[in-house]
Curated annotation (Swiss-Prot):
Its EC number is 3.2.1.1, 3.2.1.41. The active site is at 629 (nucleophile), 658 (proton donor). Its cofactor is Ca(2+). Residues 930-1022, 1158-1252 form the Fibronectin type-III domain. It catalyses: Endohydrolysis of (1->4)-alpha-D-glucosidic linkages in polysaccharides containing three or more (1->4)-alpha-linked D-glucose units; Hydrolysis of (1->6)-alpha-D-glucosidic linkages in pullulan, amylopectin and glycogen, and in the alpha- and beta-limit dextrins of amylopectin and glycogen. It comes from Thermoanaerobacterium saccharolyticum. Substrate binds at residues 527, 627, 734-735, 794, 798. One of its GO terms (molecular function) is alpha-amylase activity. GO terms for biological process: carbohydrate metabolic process. Belongs to the glycosyl hydrolase 13 family. This is Amylopullulanase. Keywords: Calcium, Carbohydrate metabolism, Glycosidase, Hydrolase, Metal-binding, Repeat, Signal. PROSITE patterns: FN3.
């Protein structure tokens, strides 16, 4: 940074002057000078607190609350006495009148005081902004930001680099802590910074860095530029956007944008159905891009496709341009896409952000990350009882012992290992990791200890679960198995005898159904137990197991022999190296190809998948669905057949995938319809944990509310809507550390079992549960979490339920929030919107409006706001509700004493206690149904105006008019509460495009969706065109002999009358072969047209403005004629080509030159197959005079079209405007200087994805076995 020094005497003078000036005014900053001052306007702050100031409430004639005029539109008022703690409403009245409704015009502002306080109010007349000191703290005058740099002298704002003389003082006229200053900047290059105050003590430069480098500013032409400084982030920027023209081999990365969460850039939001159209858009600096393309990978078809995008227009302020493509897909799949952007020699790529969470993407020089788009079966759905359910997961052995007679039904665990039975229900699970430590009493054997919990115990506690609000129970495995976890199935056809009998199972199912509870079973179909009737490693079963028969020398004798791969040395494939879990063989890539296994699990009449849903031909006695273990380690087609099978018993029965990551491919509609949402768990933990922590499943690092929202929105965006509302949103499971222990409390650990640790952990659990119960999906409670059970990693995460020793206060909390969920349909199937995500507070909104939920089902109107505050202090947040709900909607906080809240002025202010949350539910009976969306909207373009009309909407008392420059978004409301069904927009510029949409509003303020877009192009009527130049006949054809300039004129009253080119006028010269001349025979044999090319229509070239001819504007163009005799005309449009006015058509003869010899034909080589490109090469042609250029033509089955021209020294061309899987034909035409032309041969090619050979070289230790497995995802790889 460069700084000039001045004498202390001078600085002292400046400081004294500033002190004198500022002493006369309040603490608010000065504003930029505006064209007109508003000192004559009287502004009153009025509200329901005026009585405390010796006035009457809402008194617009008050002389007590008149605001002091500070200058440049700014008013200020500070209460002379403290206002009492409480909630108040207020607004600003102008000139002692309610004309215009006051400020703001719609609704009142809210003031919440937790203590008696003086309050200062501010009003900016120029921006119509109002705020108060509870929401806003201004920078003091002596620290006001100001511009300093070489720009000062250019704008008359003091001496360069002298903050003491800078008069470029920035102000905050919207009260949002963003300070601005506007000045007229001459053309030139500048450097500047921002200082706070009139010294260098605190200054900010590039990227908002304190004492950072100077900021560069290059101004191409004189311009009014606004400079901005954000007092919170210290970022500095301008609104300057120089106009780009032509190719500059540069792309402005900062202006590129694609945001998958913004419906303007991706519409509709989230996963789409097969056949549904998704619109994708990308933003760039206006006139920056030469072309934009999308490249996407189809995860199912394993194909990559590149397609061109279309430039659809520019932003209303002219700063940005937008490119668009519409896509639809005819099959379920997952799409990965990014954008390829070109400007001359520069190529940029725009893909997802580094975390690949969707939302706002990132520009890079090379391909980086792809955005994700899920396409699912249009008939995909889930049972309504899944959506918004409260689920309860039970580990049967540890829940409740209802039948002690089966406690010792078995004596052996795996092989000959004994069963270790706990006679004390309150023992901790045996953890062999602790063997050898003081106090350890276990036998050191894994998974062989039992407590006696059983199916009857669950049945006995159904009333408890019903009282907890549970509507779905998920049972860990219950089939015969040697272990306590039972993920090592010994016999799929039997209930484990320590859990009960088939009759106990049927009774549990029937009793649960009678109480409105559905039950999900756990299916383990990737592996079995080695101690099973199927493998029978230890010979405990009379049936011939696969391993048993292998030992006898013939594995095929066993009916289960083909289920497993057993090597000659007795080793076998097992799950993650555990020899207790032999894996089912994947034959030719799928377990389903093992016929006997597929029949046993899926195909047979009483196959396992179907039997347990209907064990006795009474559906009420069967389970309701399956949770399926390690599903991503089983071939997908196995699961599609599994789905088909269970649909024959209970259609759309749950298939819940155990998938710890992105389960999009599992949720396309052909198999799974839900997933264990471990991502939800991890996101909630990261938000609440407060410190880095490894819970045994992965590292947790703290995030703020904005990152939490980004992560949760990523899940919402990827999953089909029915699946998203049916995801199993868990906080813990049998595979994770207890959620209380994750949050710092473990009753069995002296270092973590203090009352303070428990209190803090329970507070965090309550926060997590509030959000879980307010969020779409199945809110899953892991047994005992609600009773205060803690526990470390497996096996400590499977402690017994503390019957008789529950944390009853925590149980009551769970009962309360689950009842709030169950009693309010809006929390089950209402739509979802993020309302607030800043720092420590996260808030979501749920709605059932217009009488419909997120799935179009009919329910009474309702709304909810759910928010959590993780900070140690109370938080007051103000939520913008303008796009969520109308004013006047009232809520009660059902967690905190039914405290009332109401939306006013397009916002709602909510008080959230420290380390707590709120669940606001709208009061019953409120009308949230909007009028019908306006239809038959018509925009009629006129001269300087657009006339709109539409049909009356039932229930509407008014209409809002929205306008944009592009279809589908960027709308600005230009009129409110229009009472009729017509509107005239006169605030338009002729020649520009305007897009309109209209919404209907009822008397309460419910606003409908916007109507379908309608487009208008206001324009001056073109009154006359003519004076087209007549080209002289017998024009000799030659590359060096273009026609003379061809002129024409246009007159449009009001547009061309004034000096200079009429704005937005387009002129084009058109030409085509007209035939019927004496030279046709010559042209047919020498200057022949390219075969297969349609040249029957006009070809158009742009004409240039020349000057004024009286009241007319004159334009010109010229032609290089390449064949035959020509007809030509000129056309004009001042409405962006929507309509044209043409001159008369003239013609002239083109005659051949002395050179009638055609070039030799180029030989076009057959190109190789490549993905999304075709690379052409050819042999050079020869000619008696020389080759002028080569023209490249392409056909995709119809006529040939010229796609490029290259010089005479270029013999190759790469066509990237192709689509994989489409067949193209190409030919090259050689032309000489007299346009004698000769075609090459035709080649045909179909671009496609090309497999490549990859060799992996791995260095391993000497003791490594001969075979090494390579883990990963390699679609369609051939080894």
């Amino acid at each position: 940074m460069y700084k000039k020094l001045f004498t202390k005497k001078f600085i002292s003078f400046v400081m004294s002057l500033l002190l004198v000036l500022t002493a006369a005014f309040s603490s608010m900053p000065f504003h930029n000078v505006y064209a007109a001052d508003n000192a004559s306007v009287v502004a009153n702050i009025v509200g329901d607190f005026q009585d405390q100031l010796g006035d009457s409430n809402w008194n617009i004639d008050s002389n007590i609350t008149i605001m002091q005029y500070v200058g440049n539109g700014l008013y200020e008022f500070t209460t002379p006495t403290q206002l009492k703690a409480g909630s108040y409403q207020y607004k600003v009245a102008l000139n002692h009148s309610w004309n215009g409704g006051g400020v703001p015009s719609q609704g009142n502002l809210t003031l919440n005081l937790t203590n008696d306080s003086y309050v200062t109010f501010w009003f900016d007349y120029n921006t119509q902004s109002v705020t108060d000191s509870t929401k806003y703290t201004p920078i003091s005058n002596d620290k006001l930001p100001r511009l300093v740099g070489t720009i000062q002298s250019a704008i008359g704002a003091g001496k360069d680099w002298d903050p003491g003389t800078s008069t470029a003082i920035m102000i905050d006229d919207n009260f949002d802590n963003v300070y601005s200053y506007t000045a007229h900047i001459p053309k030139g290059d500048y450097q500047y910074k921002v200082t706070l105050g009139n010294t260098w003590a605190e200054n900010y430069g590039a990227n908002g860095v304190q004492d950072g480098s100077n900021i560069q500013l290059s101004v191409a032409n004189d311009a009014d530029i606004t400079f901005f400084y954000d007092a919170n982030t210290h970022n500095i920027w301008t609104n300057y956007s120089p106009t780009l023209t032509g190719l500059d081999n540069n792309i402005y990365y900062d202006d590129l944008k694609h945001d998958t969460h913004d419906p303007f850039f991706r519409n509709p939001f989230g996963a789409i159905k097969v056949g549904q159209t998704v619109t994708l858009r990308i933003q760039a600096k206006n006139h920056d891009l030469e072309s934009a393309r999308i490249s996407y990978w189809d995860d199912i078809n394993k194909t990559r496709t590149e397609l061109p995008m279309t430039r659809i227009g520019e932003s209303p302020d002219g700063n940005y341009e937008y490119w668009e493509i519409k896509l639809s897909f005819d099959h379920p799949t997952r799409i990965w896409y990014y954008f390829i952007l070109k400007d001359g020699t520069k190529t940029a790529y725009y893909g997802d952000n580094d975390d690949q969470l969707g939302g706002l993407g990132k520009a890079t020089d090379t391909v980086n990350k792809d955005f994700e788009l899920t396409v699912y079966d249009k008939n995909f759905d889930t049972n309504d009882w899944m959506k918004g359910a409260v689920m309860y997961q039970i580990f049967p052995d540890r829940f409740y012992n209802g039948d002690t007679s089966n406690d010792h039904a078995k004596t052996l665990s795996r092989g000959n290992d004994p069963i270790e039975f706990h006679n004390d229900w309150n023992d901790l699970p045996d953890n062999p990791n602790n063997a050898g430590t003081p106090g350890y009493t276990g036998d050191g054997i894994w998974s062989n200890d039992f407590f006696g919990g059983d199916l009857k115990g669950i049945d006995d506690k159904l009333d408890y679960l019903k009282g907890l609000g549970v509507s779905v129970i998920y049972l860990n495995p219950i089939f015969e198995s040697p272990s306590n976890h039972k993920y090592d199935t010994a016999d799929y056809t039997k209930i484990d005898e320590m859990f009960g009998t088939t009759q106990d199972f049927e009774k549990l199912m029937s009793d649960a159904h009678a109480k409105g509870i559905n039950i999900i079973l756990d299916g383990v179909f990737n592996h079995t137990s080695d101690d099973s009737i199927y493998f029978n490693r230890y010979g405990k079963y009379p049936d011939l197991g696969a391993y048993q028969d292998w030992k006898d020398g013939n594995q095929s004798l066993s009916p289960y022999g083909d289920w497993y791969t057993i090597n000659s040395d007795g080793t076998y494939e097992c799950w993650w190296g555990y020899d207790s879990l032999p894996v089912i063989k994947s034959l030719n890539g799928s377990e389903y190809n093992v016929t006997s296994w597929a029949n046993f699990i899926i195909n047979d009449k009483n196959a396992i998948s179907k039997y347990w849903l209907n064990p006795d031909e009474n559906l009420n006695d069967g389970a309701d669905g399956w949770r399926l273990d390690v599903e991503n380690e089983v071939a997908h087609d196995f699961w599609t057949h599994f789905r088909d099978a269970i649909n024959t018993v209970k259609p759309e029965a749950p298939m819940i995938a155990e998938n710890w990551g992105d389960a999009s491919l599992d949720l396309l509609g052909d198999s799974f319809n839900s997933v264990m949402n471990y991502q939800f768990r991890n996101d909630i933990i990261d938000f609440l944990i407060g410190q880095s922590f490894d819970d045994g499943n992965g590292q947790h690092n703290p995030i703020d509310a904005a990152k939490l929202d980004q992560r949760l929105m990523s899940i919402y965006e990827r999953y089909p809507l029915p699946a998203f509302y049916s995801t199993m949103n868990l906080l813990g499971s049998h595979d994770t550390m207890s959620i209380l222990t994750v949050f710092g409390y473990n009753s069995a650990d002296p270092n973590e079992n203090s009352d303070a640790a428990k209190r803090l952990a329970e507070q965090k659990l309550k926060l997590a549960t509030i959000l879980q119960m307010g969020y779409p999906g199945m809110a899953d409670i892991y047994y005992g979490d609600e009773a205060g059970v803690s526990g470390g990693k497996d096996p400590d995460d499977r402690r017994t339920f503390p019957w008789g020793n529950e944390d009853t206060a925590l149980q009551d909390f769970f009962k309360n929030v689950s009842s709030i969920r169950n009693n309010n349909q809006v929390l089950k199937t209402g739509d979802l919107e993020t309302l607030y995500a800043q720092n420590d507070v996260y808030a979501i909104g749920r709605r059932i409006i217009n009488g419909k939920d997120a799935f179009g089902n009919s329910y009474p109107d309702s709304a909810a706001i759910v928010a959590i505050n993780r900070s140690n202090s109370d938080q007051q947040i103000t939520i913008d509700t303008t796009k969520f709900l109308r004013d006047g909607v009232a809520f009660k906080d059902l967690i905190n004493g039914d405290k009332s809240y109401t939306i006013n002025g397009g916002q709602i202010t909510i008080n959230i206690p420290a380390m707590s949350g709120v669940m606001l539910i709208s009061d019953d009976g409120q009308d949230l149904t909007a009028p019908q969306v306006p239809s038959n909207v018509v925009a009629t373009s006129g001269n300087g105006k657009v006339d709109l009309s539409w049909s009356q909407s039932d229930g509407a008392t008014g209409y809002n008019i929205y306008r944009s420059s592009v279809e589908g978004g960027l709308y600005e409301k230009i009129a409110s509460n229009v009472t009729g069904t017509t509107f005239e927009d006169t605030n338009v510029t002729n020649g520009l495009k305007y897009v309109y949409a209209i919404s209907a509003v009822d008397e309460l303020g419910n606003e409908s969706e916007m109507s379908i877009d309608t487009v208008a192009y206001p324009a001056y009527p073109i009154g006359w065109v003519g004076n087209l130049t007549q080209v002289v006949d017998n024009h000799v054809i030659s590359v060096s002999n273009p026609t003379e300039d061809i002129y024409a004129e246009v007159w449009a009253d009001g547009l061309t009358n004034s000096t200079g080119q009429g704005p937005n006028m387009i002129a084009q010269l058109g030409y085509k072969y007209v035939g019927g001349t004496v030279n046709d025979s010559v042209y047919g044999s020498v200057y022949n047209s390219v075969y297969g090319v349609d040249d029957s229509d006009f070809t158009w070239v742009n004409a240039q403005y020349v000057g004024d001819i009286g009241n007319n504007d004159q334009y010109k163009a010229s032609l290089h004629l390449i064949n035959r005799s020509m007809g030509y005309l000129m056309r004009f449009s001042d409405n962006q080509g929507q309509s044209w006015t043409t001159t008369d058509t003239l013609s002239f003869y083109v005659v051949p030159s002395d050179d009638l010899i055609k070039p030799t034909a180029p030989i076009l080589n057959q190109p190789g197959v490549e993905s999304s490109r075709v690379s052409l090469t050819w042999s050079p042609s020869t000619d008696n005079v020389g080759i002028y250029n080569y023209e490249i033509y392409r056909s995709d089955g119809g006529t040939f079209n010229k796609i490029a021209t290259v010089s005479n020294e270029v013999y190759n061309y790469v066509d990237t405007s192709v689509i994989n899987g489409t067949t193209y034909s190409y030919k090259v035409v050689a032309a000489d200087p007299s346009f004698n032309r000769t075609e090459s041969n035709v080649v045909t090619i179909k671009p496609d994805v090309v497999p490549i050979k990859v060799t992996f070289n791995v260095t391993v230790p000497d003791y490594t076995p001969n075979s090494v497995n390579l883990a990963g995802t390699f679609p369609n790889a051939t080894w």
